[in-house]
């Protein structure tokens, strides 16, 4: 089975090809560039480098958000288009879960984090048990201070992952002190190969029903809904 994994949900663009237990190819960049013009060429380049054709793909896995509204839409739309045109199954994985997978060797709780502005973050809580990643608290859009208060009550060390941890480093350290473990730079990019393996275990979804998971409405959408009340 050849799995194609696609993640454009944040600044990180990640494409991977995985066959069973082997990572055949993986492409990762962290650039403030438009994924809409780079994602598909990256898929083609990876397939060509591996002497594979689109028809060799057995399954597609996509990061469904949260993250950048535009980025999430680009990845989900691309993945759905490929799955439909190639007639292969598709599965989606939380972008936070994919990032949390980088904490495989951490003995404690894992909090992947994306900045959501105005003191808020997209985050969730995970941990590894017997080599498998498990959710402890569901993904959410929450005030960082509120989230840190919840983590403080758990009394365990927490590994924070994601480039946006740098924005909130001082607040995290002030509230959690020794409980907080800041991930190394190499762990802040979500790995599309990890995304592929997470998705390999998930059931296939209806390609027409699969939608992004933003965790909150875009500001413009929220204002429009409020105006209709």
Regions inferred by a protein language model and the residue ranges of each:
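Acyltransferase
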Residues: 181-229
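Surface "functional belts" at beta-alpha junctions
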Residues: 22, 34, 89-188, 219
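DPxDG-like acidic metal-binding loop motif
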Residues: 59-90, 95
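Short glycine-aspartate micro-motif
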Residues: 3-5, 61, 71, 110-113
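Conserved hydrophobic/aromatic positions in well-ordered beta-strands
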Residues: 16, 122-126, 213
């Amino acid at each position: 089975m050849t799995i194609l994994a696609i993640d454009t949900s944040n600044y990180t663009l990640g494409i991977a090809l995985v066959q069973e237990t082997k990572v055949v190819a993986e492409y990762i960049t962290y650039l403030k560039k438009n994924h809409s013009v780079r994602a598909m060429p990256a898929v083609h380049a990876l397939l060509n480098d591996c002497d594979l054709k689109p028809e060799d793909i057995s399954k597609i896995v996509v990061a469904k958000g949260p993250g950048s509204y535009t980025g999430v839409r680009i990845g989900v739309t691309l993945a759905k288009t490929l799955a439909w045109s190639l007639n292969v199954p598709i599965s989606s994985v939380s972008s936070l879960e994919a990032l949390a997978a980088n904490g495989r060797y951490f003995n404690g709780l894992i909090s992947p984090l994306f900045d959501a502005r105005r003191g808020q973050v997209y985050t969730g809580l995970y941990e590894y048990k017997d080599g498998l990643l498990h959710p402890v608290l569901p993904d959410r859009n929450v005030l960082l201070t509120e989230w840190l208060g919840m983590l403080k009550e758990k009394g365990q060390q927490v590994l924070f992952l994601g480039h946006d941890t740098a924005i909130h480093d001082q607040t995290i350290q002030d509230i959690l002190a020794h409980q907080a473990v800041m991930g190394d730079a190499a762990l802040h990019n979500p790995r599309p190969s990890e995304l592929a393996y997470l998705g390999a275990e998930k059931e296939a979804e209806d390609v027409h029903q699969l939608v992004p998971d933003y965790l909150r409405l875009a500001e413009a959408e929220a204002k429009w809904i409020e105006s209709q009340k």
